[in-house]
Amino acid sequence: MKVFEADSLLSEADKRTKEYKELRSQMVKLKKAFKAVADLDDSKFSGKGADNIKAFYHDHVGVTDQWIDLIDMKIVFLSSISAKLEDAKMSDAYIEESFLEHELVNAYTKSKSIMSEQKKAMKDILNDINDILPLEIFSTEDFKDKLSSADDKREKTIDKINKLDEDLKTEYAETEQNEQFIQQDFKKLQESTGKGKNATPIHYSAKAYRESDIHKKKGDIEQHSEAYLTVKKEEAKEREIKELKKKLNDGVSDPDEYLEIAKKVGYENLEPAQVQLAVQIEQAKQLEGAGEITWDIVKGVGVGLYDVGKDTVTGLWDFITDPGETLSALGNAVIHPVKTYDAISAAIEESYQKDMVNGDAYSRSRWVTYAIGSVAAAVIGTKGAGAINKADAAGKVINKASQAGKKIKDVKIPDLLPYNPKYDLAMAGDVPYNVVDGENLKNQLMSFAKGSDKEVKPFDVVDYRPSNSPLENHHGVMDVWAKHNVPNYVSRGSNTPTVALTKEQHNATKKVYREWLFEKTGKKVGGKVNWKEVSPREIQELTEKMFDAANVPKEARQQYYNAFNQYNFRK
């Protein structure tokens, strides 16, 4: 019978991980020593015997590489055990299988029997006094429900233990073929040194070893190791993102910490409101670097960030991207799109007059921070927002500001946001809220609001940005291929035609692409493709396979191809 003790398992896994890391360090040193002998210069060590010895140690380098791969697999497996226990909600559990399968089963049967006997005895008593005082026997339904629920929990716990045990053993077995290969491969290396008294490195036959059947399997083993390590790396990254997103959702009060976490998570993995808040923090930091900011302005910027990023659904981003849900959350009935736009426009105009025209430094900076962030998030979308932190963009602003004697002149807001459209925001004065053409920014917000009546549906052909949450824009591969193969082609960036897909449909296309990438590069993630070697036929077939995986209808495909083939060319 199994006994599951989480503390002991985690403690032993941690101990073994440290031992493997120490062993890995020793293997790296051993590999370095082997390589030093294998790379000896002919001027110091030459001749047929010397060549055999150097080849012998050169092949030992390959063996140590195999050991290092195996050790890495062991380390990532042991390091992932705590996450598996956490997912199973068994991080601090102590469970004896015999207790679940015997003691609790007996207790369940005995409890049912006792209750049945008590109910029967009570019924006999009530029958005896029925002519004097008729009473109904008590119901045992609640007891039965709770007893059944407890037994169901017992069975699920047994299943959970068995599944966890089986999953861990199955994954651990992933390394067995590596171990068997290393043992057989090393044995063949030793045999290739000769027999009897002649079994020395000086008689080593590199050809016999390298052309052996077992050594020819080295490529398959290396591919297996790389695939396993890649999957585990992706799992660890997904878990890190999940934990960081939870931290953001729980609340991070420090803007710098919020921005740091947002960048680690990746803007493409954040909710629209989180992206918007991160964008605005970037904006505030860059404005701070471009000129003097008073304390009133800093406070206003902080409140402006809060107005957009707070948990309640009141931000303009939420209002425009999902007006129905927003109004519902605020306790209002969903209204007609035209009336929705009129209402938003009136609110923008009112806030502009109150906070910009008739406001002070605090209210103006608050209004500008909110407005710029709202427009920026709408234009850049979630994936492009990370480009805001480019050093060259911030540098251009700072340099221009310093050349003007710390007066901001001839500086454009688009310099701060490299992928923005041309806002034509005027720049003059020496504090952020004064360098913005507020009237034009107000119009930008209203223009943004006007898009609220357009609903994007799956398989619609749309621009790559902005995103259309909860749908995802499938960028495809034709744009990157065309940049390398079509003369004078220039990518349209955020305006590149894409197909709107559900998350499940988009994941299906990614799976097809990763399989193709693996065939091309041996890697499902991070492989570098030589796009010039990819033929038009191959890119067309890949595109169609991705569309097939997402069940994109023929009409939508044709619309996508028509839109994509309207190339932009360099002059």
UniProtKB/Swiss-Prot annotation:
Disruption phenotype: Deletion of the yokI-yokJ operon has no visible growth phenotype, however it is out-competed by wild-type cells. Keywords: Coiled coil, Hydrolase, Nuclease, Secreted, Toxin. It comes from the Bacteria. Residues 1-235 form the LXG domain. Pfam families: LXG, Tox-SHH. One of its GO terms (cellular component) is extracellular region. Induction: Expressed on rich and minimal solid media likely in early stationary phase; not dependent on DegSU. Not expressed in liquid LB, but only under conditions that promote biofilm formation. Its main location: secreted. The keyword Nucleus does not apply. It is found in: Secreted. InterPro entries: Bact_secretion_toxin, LXG_dom, Tox-SHH_dom. Residues 5-39, 141-192 form a coiled coil. Transmembrane segments: none annotated. PROSITE patterns: LXG (PS51756). GO terms for molecular function: nuclease activity; toxin activity. The keyword Secreted applies. Signal peptide: none annotated. In the N-terminal section; belongs to the LXG family. Toxic component of one of 6 LXG toxin-immunity modules in this strain. They promote kin selection, mediate competition in biofilms, and drive spatial segregation of different strains, indicating that LXG toxins may help avoid warfare between strains in biofilms. Mediates intercellular competition during biofilm formation; disruption of the operon disadvantages the bacteria, but overexpression of the cognate immunity protein restores growth in competition with wild-type. Probably interacts with cognate immunity protein YokJ but not with non-cognate immunity proteins. The interaction inhibits the toxic activity of YokJ. This is Toxin YokI. It comes from Bacillus subtilis (strain 168).
